[in-house]
Amino acid sequence: MIGRLRGILLEKQPPELLIEVNGIGYEVQMPMSCFYELPNIGEEAIIYTHFVVREDAQLLYGFNTVKERALFREVIKANGVGPKLGLAILSGMTASQFVASVEREDISTLVKLPGVGKKTAERLVVEMKDRLKGWSAGDLFTPFTDAAPVDSGSTSSNSAEEEAVSALLALGYKPVQASKVVSQIAKPDMTSEQLIREALKSMV
């Protein structure tokens, strides 16, 4: 099992990245709440990974800390929640927000996440509340900040908007919804990561 990667960040295409380790490039999918904290392209990154083997693919999901990965592993233990939905859940809200929503049994907030209906939200609360009991979000997970993300290298506002829409589609949002939200919040000087962050905030 691949549990940790340390290497040079080659590409950032939210929610995916490419990291080179000893001459080998690894494609990794990462929740946007973690993606914002990545270093610049060309710099060294350390990523904790969850390895998934399927009949048709081998997938890596990446996180900045062991604690964030631990939460992801707890999320995908819930009935009906796979890695793809787990990625969407932890992109739509931060680790601390998710823990708080489960502890408060806040179904109305959870159902705003892509792919999460009322039944899935209820299962998340029922199955995870006891497992999260006593877990302090502040102690367990990297706090989410409003610090400006690094420039993802977008060459124009149009390409930034296209990348943002593509990222939202990859997370499970519908094309019309993704395009509408991005167009509403887009400003000429915004990077794709800033657009994604603001879009996700507006939809939860």
Curated annotation (Swiss-Prot):
It holds the Pfam family RuvA_N. One of its GO terms (molecular function) is four-way junction DNA binding. Residues 156-204 are annotated as: Domain III. Residues 144-155 are annotated as: Flexible linker. Gene3D superfamilies: 5' to 3' exonuclease, C-terminal subdomain (1.10.150.20), DNA helicase RuvA subunit, C-terminal domain (1.10.8.10), Nucleic acid-binding proteins (2.40.50.140). Keywords: Cytoplasm, DNA damage, DNA recombination, DNA repair, DNA-binding. InterPro entries: DNA_helicase_Holl-junc_RuvA_I (IPR013849), Hlx-hairpin-Hlx_DNA-bd_motif (IPR003583), NA-bd_OB-fold (IPR012340), RuvA (IPR000085), RuvA_2-like (IPR010994), RuvA_C (IPR011114), RuvA_C_sf (IPR036267). CDD domains: UBA_RuvA_C. One of its GO terms (cellular component) is cytoplasm. Signal peptide: none annotated. It is found in: Cytoplasm. Residues 65-143 are annotated as: Domain II. HAMAP family: DNA_HJ_migration_RuvA. Belongs to the RuvA family. The RuvA-RuvB-RuvC complex processes Holliday junction (HJ) DNA during genetic recombination and DNA repair, while the RuvA-RuvB complex plays an important role in the rescue of blocked DNA replication forks via replication fork reversal (RFR). RuvA specifically binds to HJ cruciform DNA, conferring on it an open structure. The RuvB hexamer acts as an ATP-dependent pump, pulling dsDNA into and through the RuvAB complex. HJ branch migration allows RuvC to scan DNA until it finds its consensus sequence, where it cleaves and resolves the cruciform DNA. NCBIfam families: ruvA. Homotetramer. Forms an RuvA(8)-RuvB(12)-Holliday junction (HJ) complex. HJ DNA is sandwiched between 2 RuvA tetramers; dsDNA enters through RuvA and exits via RuvB. An RuvB hexamer assembles on each DNA strand where it exits the tetramer. Each RuvB hexamer is contacted by two RuvA subunits (via domain III) on 2 adjacent RuvB subunits; this complex drives branch migration. In the full resolvosome a probable DNA-RuvA(4)-RuvB(12)-RuvC(2) complex forms which resolves the HJ. This is Holliday junction branch migration complex subunit RuvA. The gene is ruvA.
